[in-house]
């Protein structure tokens, strides 16, 4: 979940459900924690063997861990949502015991009950959101106004991604796709031209280095050139493909990203790093988070 990323509240700020629940959860945790401290200081047994809060002390730290984990969650939240849901269910079950303090007379007890009542409601919203599958009614309701749901906000701190316009390179008398293309065949080389022909393969296109198939051209001994009929070159490896595990919405802040639906098959141009360079079925080339894809 943390993935080496620095702290960024962008995901929370961009999602209405998370924003509202965090506004409620943080003060509620403080109220519950302060109430437990006050109750222990004033009403616990003199020998300290009979605490007032009991198991709520375990739950208060579990709740803090879950709140912080969701607050610093990145674009791979979807991969950890089931684990988070399990711990949230445990925290909710324990929190119900803390709600009973709301019926007591001392002010510290009432504070404990109010704090845990609000935290219980927040936990239930989080559980419903994290466990709802896409295209369901509850998911669409809780995700209204967000940027792509569990994949809404993306971060790539520490990730080096080569742009498409930087892909074509020149060196050693050869023009072709750079090493970042992940094993794709070279394009047109000066050695091939001098020897009297162009080898069939992938060559850089005129627009943003998109690989395109070129027709094999031969030259006979009299200098005449002839075009062979295009066919499948068995020596050229087929491009790698990947299946989308989750739907992803491209960030409006990065024009290099591409959007795709769950289950779509994408053509992988570069499979190195945390961000793959892919081509969608619509022919759009850009980058996509690798943890949302599985190579076929």
Swiss-Prot record:
Q: Which residues lie on this side of the membrane: Extracellular?
A: 36-51, 103-109
Which superkingdom? Eukaryota
Is Calcium among this UniProt entry's keywords?
no
Task: Name the CDD domains for this protein.
Answer: SH3_Sho1p
Q: Which SMART domains match?
A: SH3
Q: Ranges for the SH3 domain?
A: 237-296
Primary location class: membrane
| The UniProt record lists the keyword Membrane | yes
Full protein name: High osmolarity signaling protein SHO1
- Lineage of origin: Eukaryota, Fungi, Dikarya, Basidiomycota, Agaricomycotina
Gene name, per UniProt, is SHO1
